[in-house]
Amino acid sequence: MRVTQLSSQSFIFPSPELALREPNGLLALGGDLTAPRLLAAYQRGIFPWFNPGEMILWWSPDPRAVLFPEDLHISRSMRRFIRHCPYRFTLNHAFADVISACATERDEGTWIGRDVQQAYCQLHALGHAHSLEVWLENELVGGLYGVAVGAVFCGESMFSRADNASKSALMVFCHHFTQHGGELIDCQVLNAHTASLGAVEIPRNFFLQQLSQLQFSPLPAECWLPQSLNFSSAMQ
């Protein structure tokens, strides 16, 4: 089966069912990272992932890794940490700083090149991409970012520069997300870190069914307004 070459004149993607089995989920190549194309991709359960300087690759793996926010796993050690959590949390206060940190904190290299950062910052400016920041005093020590598609949040990356910063970020985000009607977090591909936090694999078809329904359930505007978030309320 051949991988589809995307047209520069159209934002139409092939069906995810046509994705390769090996490498798992590779569906298409080419195109660009303009906001309309990125949104068209996420609405169809497709995401970009490629090495900087190389052709853009588009993926929809099977199975798909997801996190149901209510199933977030909090370990005993994390519960002990929570009692004296030194951090404060904000939403959409420093998106560009978060995505830049996600790019630089990867020892094994990153796909988040300058063009990717610019593309997602544009999505953020349009109100589709969002970040959660973790602060120790006035220093950014952790965070995550992703793209909202109705009641689904497509998580892209997270980073941590202090103990449990990224785990705390996800805990606070899950609480805020569900409080405003969010139902599903797309983790794309399962790894040891996301699995330890409660992410599971589900069949791609089931994920696409959920996405097709939940993307038409937009969360209230106040969910994504820049704001400070209360860590203690997330633990109740």
Swiss-Prot record:
Pfam families registered for this protein in UniProt: Leu_Phe_trans
Alphabetical UniProt keywords: Acyltransferase, Cytoplasm, Transferase
Keyword Transit peptide on entry: no
One Gene Ontology term, aspect cellular component: cytoplasm
Enzyme class: transferase
UniProt GO molecular function: leucyl-tRNA--protein transferase activity
Places the protein is found: Cytoplasm
EC number(s) stated in the UniProt entry for this protein: 2.3.2.6
Transmembrane segments annotated in the record for this chain: none
Designated name of the protein: Leucyl/phenylalanyl-tRNA--protein transferase
Organism: Yersinia pestis
Record gene name: aat
